[in-house]
Regions:
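Claisen-condensing/thiolase-fold acyl-transfer catalytic domains that form or cleave C-C bonds
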Residues: 1-101, 112-113
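Long, low-complexity, intrinsically disordered segments
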Residues: 105-115
Length: 115
């Protein structure tokens, strides 16, 4: 439900940074979020490479944002979790396409990217 509400299925996903503390979590989350087989998951190494307490979820968001800012991807999913049995989840879709304001043009020098 969180992935659907965040808009995961609203367009192609280039990369997904998933909070997967165990290898089987990737298969579960990939399936439940409906991520295509060609979506690159955890190119950073994810929490299996480093899982700092209380920051691992924010790192997932930062990893996707960084890839959008450097131009390697256009749209990505970041997932964070906490609590027992993964019952507390956050899914964020970050998009590199610049949004237009109601006047039809962007008025900010800040990079777009959150949803």
């Amino acid at each position: 439900l969180a992935a659907e509400a965040a808009g995961v299925g609203d367009g192609p996903i280039d990369v997904a940074e998933l909070h997967t503390c165990f290898t089987h979590h990737e298969a579960i989350l990939r399936n439940e979020m409906g991520l295509a087989d060609d979506v690159v998951v955890n190119p950073s190494g994810g929490p299996l490479a480093a899982n700092p307490m209380m920051a691992a979820g924010m790192i997932r968001i930062g990893e996707v944002a960084n890839r959008i800012f450097d131009g390697t991807v256009n749209r990505g999913v970041a997932h964070a979790t906490g609590g027992h049995l993964m019952q507390h989840n956050l899914v964020a879709v970050l998009d590199g396409e610049q949004s237009a304001t109601s006047e039809g043009s962007s008025t900010s020098d800040e990079p777009e990217g959150g949803r």
